[in-house]
Structure formats: C-alpha cells, structure tokens
C-alpha cells in the first residue's frame, strides 16, 4: 500500500516546481499590473486597498491537477474614524458590519473625494452590504479592463513579463480574469474582502487565534443559506485563511493526504463535499494529533484520516473549525450522507484487504512494462 500511494503522490497529485514557479511569476505580474489600473480608476479603491492575499488550494499546496484556477482576495480596509463594528450574526460563521460613526467621518478631509462613493457600499442603516460591494467591484473591474487596448472581444494587458489577452467574467462573489497567451491559459478569481486586526477578533464561541504571527482575519461577501425575510446582504462570511495556512504547513504527509482525499472524492462523484470540508477534517486532526503523526508512513496517515473522514460523514456533522456551532454538512440530505458512509466503508475495506484497488478508487491505472521493469502511468481523467 505504501509504494502505491507514494507512486500516486509523486506522479499524479503533485505539481512540478517549474509549473509552480512559472505561474507565480506570471500571476503576480498580471495581478499587480491590473490592481494598479483599478487604483487609477477609483479613488475609493485606492484609499481602501491594502494588499492581495493569494488564497485557495494552489497557494495552500493542496491543489490536485494542473494549476489553471487561482483565488485571490483583494484586502481592503475601512476608515477607523467611522468606527466599524463587527457583530456575530444568528448564522454561525457570519457577521454583520456597521459603521457607527459614519456622519462624523464624512466630515473628515479624506472623505471629501470618496465619501459619496463609500456610502453606496452601505445599506440605509449604515451596514456594509455584500450586494452593494459586489456591484461596485464589478463596475470597477470592467472600467479598469475597458482602459486596456482591445483585440477583438478581449483586452491586452502589458506587464513586466509579457503581454496577455484578458477577458472578464462574473461568477458568485468573484470577478474572473481569463488570462491567456500562446503558452498559458488561467482563470484568476478576484474577490473584494475586508481585513481586520486582532482587536476585532470575533468572540461568542469562536476559537481564539492560535497563530500569534497572523493577527488579521477577513470578511468575504459570500451569502449564507437563510430565510428570505432575513437581510441577506448584511451577512459577511468570516475567513481565517492565513491562520489555516500556518496550521497545515510543515507537516510531512498532511498535504499529500488532503490531495488523495480530494482525488478519491472526485472519482467517487461526491462533488457535494466541498474541498473546505476536507480541509476542516484535517484542521481538527492537527488539533488531535502531534506533529510526529504526520511523519509516519503515508499509507498510515492517509488511512487514518480517511477513517476520520468517514466517522464525520457517519455522524452527519463536520464542525466548523472556528465555531463548532456551525455544521458544515447541514445542507446535505441525510440519505445522501448515509449512502456516502456506506460507500466509504466499502472503499476502506477494499483498500485494506486489496491495496491494488487504490488505483481504481483514485481514478488511475498503471501498466507494467517488462522491458525496463518500470511502471508507466496514465491518468484516467484530469482533475
């Protein structure tokens, strides 16, 4: 079993260092150039912009397959003088943000140029509105893109590392830049988020910050599942990505295990299990086990975590790492989870009694070549 998993990890679910290096250079150059255009077009964005956070599975080291999609958070700040106040909502994992001293800030010099635009991000009671922020962000991205030279239906973005064709698409809370040239084609999701320091860390049953070197957290304009009579546009999802990245780092077989679990999920067709649910199982495992566990053989780590994962599915509950009141599986039907639990039980049994079935369960086949006694691998499907 160990040799099989090591082969799969090495040949299929790990990205080459050359690909990682190339994509990092191109992506950083494109994003910094485009953000510069956005700052030129909008004084409010220029005032609030802090930095880019390179988020998602690629930068966490958890991506399976070719790196073609990237998640970037544009971190913005709110004027302190306006007294932004975060309060936990009735939905675990979500908060409200209200500007308690907006009128006084509007009289400050810095508000003279941007005050009217800033008020458009709020609702009638001075709560920061996800809907309004998304509309503002969509307009800004299009204005920045429209300033670029055109080539047919696309725009040309010239950066220090080359010129790329860019087109804009909208998807959920993100504005997607589709970037391509003769050698590369990638999608970059840009999401406007707001960043806060440790003085605003949420309480009320939220876990305290376990990573002192990362005091900041974000709020993201992602809507919750909530009754129609609720003010949905006031709900902001909390994000502790920087802390999570530190918690899962420098643990030898942790990231290969996550990739194997994602590969298994995809091949079994369990697409209702979000990658973040798997990451949350891992975060709980980090709490429950010391660092030496992740240095044990990959087969031991993978099978142990797979059994942990099955237990969560059997109990129909994966507690949100940062607030256990939030069950990440609450939106999935009981019958669906029962069927998944039964399937995982059979998978675990087969893997333990017949390790060669791992190839099939992970969607990979291999052929033995007697000529040189080496295995040659071929993916059944690209993830």
From Swiss-Prot:
Belongs to the mab-21 family. Its cofactor is Mg(2+); Mn(2+). Keywords: Antiviral defense, ATP-binding, GTP-binding, Immunity, Innate immunity, Magnesium, Manganese, Metal-binding, Nucleotide-binding, Nucleotidyltransferase, RNA-binding, Transferase. Nucleotidyltransferase that catalyzes the formation of cyclic GMP-AMP (2',3'-cGAMP) from ATP and GTP and plays a key role in innate immunity. Acts as a key sensor of double-stranded RNA (dsRNA), the presence of dsRNA in the cytoplasm being a danger signal that triggers the immune responses. Directly binds dsRNA, activating the nucleotidyltransferase activity, leading to synthesis of 2',3'-cGAMP, a second messenger that binds to and activates Sting, thereby triggering the immune response via activation of the NF-kappa-B transcription factor. It catalyses: GTP + ATP = 2',3'-cGAMP + 2 diphosphate; GTP + ATP = pppGp(2'-5')A + diphosphate; pppGp(2'-5')A = 2',3'-cGAMP + diphosphate. The gene is cGLR. This is Cyclic GMP-AMP synthase-like receptor. The keyword Transport does not apply. GO terms for molecular function: 2',3'-cyclic GMP-AMP synthase activity; ATP binding; double-stranded DNA binding; GTP binding; metal ion binding; RNA binding. Mn(2+) binds at residues 286-287, 290. ATP binds at residues 57, 69-71, 241-244, 262, 275-279. Gene3D superfamilies: 1.10.1410.40, 3.30.460.90.
């Amino acid at each position: 079993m160990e040799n099989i998993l090591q082969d799969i990890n090495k040949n299929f679910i790990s990205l080459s260092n050359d690909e990682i290096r190339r994509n990092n250079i191109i992506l950083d150059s494109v994003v910094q150039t485009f953000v510069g255009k956005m700052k030129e077009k909008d004084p409010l964005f220029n005032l609030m912009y802090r930095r880019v956070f390179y988020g998602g599975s690629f930068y966490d080291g958890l991506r399976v397959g070719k790196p073609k999609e990237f998640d970037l958070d544009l971190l913005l700040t709110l004027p302190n003088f306006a007294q932004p106040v975060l309060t936990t909502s009735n939905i675990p994992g979500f908060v409200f943000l209200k500007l308690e001293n907006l009128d006084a800030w509007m009289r400050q010099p810095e508000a003279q140029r941007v005050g009217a635009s800033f008020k458009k991000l709020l609702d009638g009671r001075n709560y920061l509105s996800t809907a309004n922020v998304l509309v503002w962000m969509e307009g800004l991205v299009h204005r920045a893109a429209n300033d670029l030279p055109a080539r047919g239906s696309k725009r040309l973005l010239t950066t220090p590392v080359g010129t790329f064709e860019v087109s804009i698409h909208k998807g959920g809370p993100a504005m997607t830049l589709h970037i391509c040239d003769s050698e590369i084609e990638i999608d970059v999701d840009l999401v406007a988020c707001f960043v806060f320091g440790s003085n605003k860390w949420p309480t009320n049953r939220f876990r305290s910050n376990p990573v002192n070197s990362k005091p900041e957290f974000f709020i993201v304009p992602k809507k919750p599942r909530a009754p129609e009579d609720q003010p949905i546009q006031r709900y902001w999802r909390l994000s502790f990505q920087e802390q999570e990245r530190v918690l899962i780092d420098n643990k030898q077989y942790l990231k290969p295990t996550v990739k194997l679990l994602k590969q298994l999920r995809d091949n079994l067709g369990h697409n209702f299990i979000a990658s973040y649910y798997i990451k949350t199982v891992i975060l709980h495992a980090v709490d429950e086990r010391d660092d030496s566990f992740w240095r044990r053989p990959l087969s031991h780590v993978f099978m142990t975590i797979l059994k942990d994962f099955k237990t969560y599915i059997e109990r129909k509950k994966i507690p949100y790492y940062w607030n256990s009141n939030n069950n990440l599986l609450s939106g999935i039907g009981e019958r669906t989870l029962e069927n998944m639990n039964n399937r995982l039980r059979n998978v675990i049994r087969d893997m333990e009694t017949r390790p060669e079935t791992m190839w099939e369960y992970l969607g990979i086949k291999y052929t033995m070549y007697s000529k040189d006694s080496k295995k040659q691998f071929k993916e059944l499907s690209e993830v």
